[in-house]
A protein has these predicted regions:
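ATP-binding Walker
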Residues: 13
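P-loop (Walker A) phosphate-binding loop of NTP-binding proteins
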Residues: 10
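Post-Walker A helix-loop "phosphate-sensing" segment adjacent to the P-loop in P-loop NTPases
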Residues: 24-33
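ATP-dependent small-molecule kinase phosphotransfer cores
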Residues: 35-99, 124, 130, 134-140
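Walker A/P-loop
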Residues: 16
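NTP-dependent small-molecule kinase module
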Residues: 2, 21, 78-79, 144-196
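A glycine- and Lys/Arg-enriched "phosphate-lid" helix/loop adjacent to the NTP-binding pocket
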Residues: 103-157
């Protein structure tokens, strides 16, 4: 049975950073589905979503996840850490592929922490906001308060879905990556996982 750790969570919860740290601590490979999408298509997930639409992005994401299944199977890898994109909770095909690779851990950060991280990345150009997640940008926010309000709806919806999908929910408190990595390890230990 594969014992991969698949990290789920809202954008900016730390999936990639924490996935990298976990893979180093467990001496196993790390993969980020967003990076796999970029390698396969030559476009970032955001570019695909904005230029080709949400359906094209979901197809690219599913292809990337199915590729990981084939790749890891061919390598004979049984232990690895995979970080996913924030919207994977709505992509059934991608989730089914990843479920065959291990178990899901939901990295739950407080809404205010994730919203602040998104707001910090905003770039202003000619009085307009740039560098927003596509699901926020399409709502045409004018102020950072608009961004936080739009994000709140997505946060509530996705948090509910992540909880349904995950075998383990790990509440993170916006501490340092190292401290959050320890929280994940404690969650694994409390579930008597092989990784602990």
């Amino acid at each position: 049975m594969n014992q991969g750790i698949i990290l789920l969570g809202i954008k900016h919860c730390g999936k990639s950073t924490l996935g990298n740290l976990l893979s180093k601590q467990f001496h196993c490979p790390f993969f980020d589905t967003d990076d796999v999408i970029t390698e396969m298509t030559g476009l970032s997930p955001r570019q695909i979503y904005q230029e080709q639409g949400p359906q094209a992005f979901m197809e690219a994401e599913a292809k990337a996840c199915n590729y990981l299944v084939r790749y890891l199977s061919a390598l004979g890898e049984k232990e690895y850490v995979i970080a996913t994109g924030g919207g994977i909770c709505n992509n059934t095909e991608a989730l089914e592929a990843l479920a065959s690779l291990g178990f899901f851990i939901f990295l739950e950060v407080p809404e205010a922490v994730a919203a602040e991280r998104i707001i910090q990345e905003i770039e202003w150009e000619d009085g307009k906001m740039k560098n927003l997640p596509a699901y926020i940008a399409k709502e045409n926010p004018v102020t950072t308060e608009d961004v936080a309000r739009i994000f709140s709806g997505f946060y509530q919806q996705r948090t509910k879905r992540y909880r349904q999908l995950a075998q383990i929910t790990c509440p993170l408190q916006g501490e340092s990556p190292e401290e959050n990595c320890q929280l994940i390890q404690q969650a694994l230990f409390s579930q008597d996982c092989r990784w602990s």
